[in-house]
């Protein structure tokens, strides 16, 4: 058990870190020069960091103190989101760079998004598995065990594009030198580019729309389980049964086919 305000901090702080590191990671990846390209090394490293830290993140025990569990989960989740940033930012960029044709690129990203949406159809049923006494003695044991299998499975899938996907060559004259000597100049160019980006009104409108859409989605996804179990069924997960899973799956299916 943990105080509600601490649970809120556990959800907010790693996300705040994620928001700050995403544009920085994009800038670093854009200007990286390696024999394997500028995307694949980060995808490889990020998949391992995020997969291992996801497993570690859920290895908490109710016997530990609230302070220990809060600190442990916060630190491991920050490492997880950092690894996710290292993986996802170059991964998305590599997807857009796989084709120079606008329509083909749109189809590629649409298929990738459609496939990824199926994860949200499956994931809600993890609640049912975790709370099933015939599978796990306690829900916390279920979370610890299931996280190992999920983390390893996702790690194996995430590392595939780093090994098998080829990236388009980039003119080195269009890239900056990421060295400590050029740190000040690179920082100024990063900030200048960040400001110039937000001067584009169509892009700014898209950012605002995305902000509200993702906030609405994450709010419903994050609280639906607790509303169904603790408000509608007085905190009894056994009585709630498979309703939380059905709610999540049907919602995800609607967005998948829309």
Question: What is each residue range found by the language model?
Answer:
Residues 1-258:
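Membrane-embedded alpha-helical bundles of multi-pass transporters/translocases
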